[in-house]
């Protein structure tokens, strides 16, 4: 039976001694990551050679024997080994063009440590981590799931910049049974004014989470700018700013989860555009609004939830002119300005709402993609009919 990895993220409440030990572990993980990355770069610059995982593992052993770095042995070796594995995997993803070049880690950002099965134990009194004298208290958020029976393969202990602690349990579970078919498909046109418009005519408003918190965030950032560097007050104020950002991030993620789950439950096939978000944010006037929508995260949620539910997410070519094509007769306009929200097809006289028309075309194109076994969908430029447009602002 196929297995799927599921993550359960819960709040953790370490005591003072545990927090000190975990922060020390975070620091050691960060040092190992940064020194390994620096050595990789130095070796490639001088010798034009890569570095294998075995070589980084040998270097870590040598560092622990160095009197200047012997404090690396005060924490569990498992998170340090995992840091090496993750960096090796990160370079593999980079060379395969599936990720960015690995970057150095900062002590000011999110801190984390990964523990495999050999370095933790789940007991009734809490989570026992390697080299800790007391169990870490966590708050389990799924009353219908017994944590003791999950058998996690890995746990990740993390601390956010706003001071909150979390534990993430990675669990391999059996592939869930697919949802029953409902016989409905949908095209989704993502936007800024409205987060999404569906081919059914439904409009999902953009909650604009950043806009609702922007005033308070600016106030806290001004206070932070007035604080003296290195002072305790600056550290406290910096945490308040991070907490504001966390509220925005959590609210956006909650909205994306609920929206994606609703679509996966309601439709057998979901068509979306392959938006070039990285290119779109280069527009200075729209970059902030686009970044606040979370289109990329929304697509990722749709894809993994659909896979687990036995649904289909079909990505339509980004150059497909969904807004300029009449969904009734297929007439293709020569041009359509961004400010035009309604237009009348000169071919059949149908009056279109720009976004609903685009969503319907995306749904149709997604069906063609499935019929063509995943082939790209673009109208034939040689046969597409072009003509003037009757625009209605």
Briefly describe each language-model feature range.
Residues 126-138, 169-174, 200-202, 347-349:
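Secondary-structure transition/turn motif
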Residues 43-69, 151-152, 159-299, 370-393:
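Substrate-contacting helices/loops that form the catalytic groove of nucleic-acid
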């Amino acid at each position: 039976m196929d297995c799927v990895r599921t993550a359960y993220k819960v709040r953790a409440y370490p005591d003072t001694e545990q927090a000190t030990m975990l922060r020390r572990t975070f620091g050691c993980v960060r040092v190992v990551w940064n020194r390994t990355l620096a050595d990789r770069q130095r070796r490639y610059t001088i010798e034009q050679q890569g570095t294998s995982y075995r070589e980084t593992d040998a270097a870590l052993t040598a560092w622990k024997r160095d009197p200047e770095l012997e404090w690396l042995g005060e924490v569990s070796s498992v998170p340090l080994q995992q840091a090496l594995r993750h960096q090796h995997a990160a370079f593999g993803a980079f060379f395969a063009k599936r990720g960015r070049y690995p970057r150095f880690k900062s002590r000011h950002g999110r801190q984390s440590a990964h523990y495999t099965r050999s370095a933790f134990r789940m007991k009734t009194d809490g989570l026992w981590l390697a080299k800790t004298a007391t169990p870490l208290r966590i708050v389990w958020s799924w009353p219908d799931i017994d944590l003791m029976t999950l058998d996690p393969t890995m746990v990740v202990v993390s601390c956010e910049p706003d001071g909150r602690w979390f534990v993430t349990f990675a669990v391999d579970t059996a592939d869930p049974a697919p949802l029953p078919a409902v016989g409905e498909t949908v095209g989704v046109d993502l936007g800024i004014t409205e987060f999404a418009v569906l081919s059914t005519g439904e409009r999902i408003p953009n909650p604009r989470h950043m806009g609702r918190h922007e005033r308070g965030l600016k106030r806290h950032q001004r206070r932070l700018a007035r604080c003296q560097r290195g002072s305790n007050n600056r550290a406290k104020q910096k945490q308040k700013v991070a907490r504001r950002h966390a509220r925005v991030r959590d609210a956006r993620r909650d909205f994306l989860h609920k929206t994606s789950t609703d679509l996966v439950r309601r439709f057998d096939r979901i068509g979306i555009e392959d938006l070039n978000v990285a290119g779109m944010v280069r527009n200075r006037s729209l970059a902030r609004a686009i970044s606040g929508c979370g289109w990329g995260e929304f697509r990722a949620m749709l894809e993994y939830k659909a896979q687990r539910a036995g649904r289909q997410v079909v990505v339509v070519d980004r150059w497909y002119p969904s807004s300029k094509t009449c969904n009734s007769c297929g007439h293709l306009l020569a041009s359509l300005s961004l400010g035009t929200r309604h237009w009348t097809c000169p071919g059949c006289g149908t009056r279109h709402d720009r976004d609903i028309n685009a969503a319907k075309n995306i749904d149709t194109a997604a069906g063609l993609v499935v019929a063509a076994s995943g082939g790209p969908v673009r109208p034939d430029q040689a046969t597409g009919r072009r003509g003037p447009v009757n625009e209605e602002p």
